[in-house]
Amino acid sequence: NLHTIEATTEIVQLLDSDEQIELAMNRWLKILAQHIQVDSAEIFQLQADTDTMNVAVEWLSPGQISYFDKTSGIPVNSFLHTEKPLVVSTDSLGKTGSEEIEEIGMKAVMIFPILKQESGNMVLSLNHRRQAHVWSMAEIKFTSDAVKILQSILTRRIQKNSLAGSYAALEEILDNVGCAIYVTDQNTGRMLFANQILKN
């Protein structure tokens, strides 16, 4: 679908962004949250030593107020300590493990670990607060792919290493987009990348 391709392209372009990491993360979160149409979205930086968290970036849909009255030193919800993605739709609330999500008034939540660090992990939270919602496979897949790109951006910034790792992850995502994509050098016109669909 065209919207998905446009949103994917916008997110992929952030790989080449030289802007401050907070700005890149803000743009990334806005593109993702608007595309899957959630009420609010946050990236939390968990503090390992104090069991508190900071709100690194937050996005709110029009009319929504932040759930948090401060951005640092917030007690961590236990469901944020997840090693793998946690997807809770309205129809699975009430089952074991989702009580805490229900208690804070969320109707549906997706939690994705972004970065593991000794100082504390970075975690994404996407939330439906107003109405019941059942996450679709398309929403989950888009989020998963977007997270992989953000991980590439962060890894690149942290290590300032070669582009090889990022492009491997990017290549994998672009090979699964479902349409042909190629990238050329604006100055020389030389093709820099073509995904598998185009090569076939």
Task: Map each language-model feature to its residues.
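Soluble sensory domains of the PAS superfamily and closely related sensory modules
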Residues: 77-86, 92-95
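Amphipathic alpha-helical "output/dimerization" segments
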Residues: 134-155
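Signal-transducing coupling segments at domain and membrane junctions
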Residues: 89-108, 128
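PAS/LOV and related PAS-like sensory modules
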Residues: 1-45, 145, 152, 163-189
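Short hydrophobic/glycine-rich mini-motifs in sensory/regulatory modules
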Residues: 114-124
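A short, aliphatic-rich beta-strand micro-motif
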Residues: 107-115
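Short beta-strand-to-loop transition segments that serve as allosteric relay/switch motifs
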Residues: 61, 122-134
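GAF sensory/regulatory domain recognition
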Residues: 30-33, 42-77, 83, 191-192, ...
